[in-house]
């Protein structure tokens, strides 16, 4: 049975500044975590969920990612690429440029530099607003969080018994979240905050394992968790 979101996007254009000098010669999505590199964990999970096509945006050392992944056949996917000038578009601009390659609405987006044990079929079958975010407990490096979750509503400010949480980098978006923005550099965070202000953003809390692999310490932690997960299978 086809999955509810047949098209997905993986964000893989970042420079990985905090992991230099490693990322001077290796793009962050190709860093190994366990038996696969970061981006391959996503590709395998997307294929298992029933995704047909994945768009990957590329900039820094993007040719290495494209050479490694190819057309996606070995993952059971069709993979296409959206090439960007390095540092030119930001996350929102990268998604905006790639919309021409994404013909389904809504669609799933995953940051290429996170590691998680999320089962993608736990995402909702449909969304009512412009976006839906997967939120996690606030890590040490982001103690104040990004948003507040009140029921299934994502808010910018606390209300009642709402909970402060961190955006995981995994979301479901409608095209109209981006369509009204001019082409070029666009902050995804700003678009999401605008959607939250307009009561157009829903979310869910994910209590499982999740790491933003942005520093050497977090990379080591992700590798430890991956080893532990393999032993527990």
Model-derived regions, located:
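Short alpha-helical oligomerization interface
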Residues: 24-28
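Catalytic-core segments of class I nucleotidyltransferases/pyrophosphorylases
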Residues: 108, 115, 120-127, 138-141, ...
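A phosphate-binding catalytic loop at a beta-strand-loop-alpha-helix junction
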Residues: 5-22
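Conserved beta-strand segments of alpha/beta enzyme cores
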Residues: 29, 78-80, 130, 200-202
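Conserved N-terminal catalytic core of the sugar/cofactor nucleotidyltransferase
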Residues: 1-10, 32, 36-111, 180-183, ...
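Short beta-strand-to-loop element that shapes/binds the nucleotide-sugar donor at the catalytic cleft/hinge
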Residues: 132-146
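Hydrophobic packing residues within well-ordered alpha-helices of enzyme cores
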Residues: 19, 65-69, 222
């Amino acid at each position: 049975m086809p999955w509810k979101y047949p098209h997905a996007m993986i964000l893989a254009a970042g420079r990985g500044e905090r992991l230099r000098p490693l990322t001077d010669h290796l793009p962050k999505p190709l860093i190994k975590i366990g038996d696969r590199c970061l981006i391959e964990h996503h590709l395998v999970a997307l294929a298992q969920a029933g995704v047909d096509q994945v768009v990957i945006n590329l900039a820094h050392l993007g040719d290495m990612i494209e050479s490694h992944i190819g057309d996606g056949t070995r993952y059971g996917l069709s993979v296409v690429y959206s090439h960007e000038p390095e540092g030119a578009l930001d996350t929102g601009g990268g998604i905006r440029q790639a919309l021409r390659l994404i013909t389904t609405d809504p669609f799933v987006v995953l940051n290429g530099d996170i590691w998680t044990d999320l089962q993608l079929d736990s995402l909702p079958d449909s969304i009512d607003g412009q976006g839906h975010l997967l939120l996690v407990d606030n890590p040490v490096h982001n103690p104040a969080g990004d948003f507040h979750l009140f029921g299934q509503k994502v808010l910018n400010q606390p209300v009642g018994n709402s909970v402060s949480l961190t955006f995981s980098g995994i979301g479901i978006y409608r095209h109209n979240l981006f369509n009204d923005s001019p082409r070029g550099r666009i902050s995804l965070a700003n678009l999401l905050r605008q959607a939250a202000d307009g009561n157009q953003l829903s979310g869910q809390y994910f209590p499982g394992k999740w790491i933003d692999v942005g520093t050497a310490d977090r990379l080591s932690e992700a590798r430890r968790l991956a080893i532990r997960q393999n032993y527990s299978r």
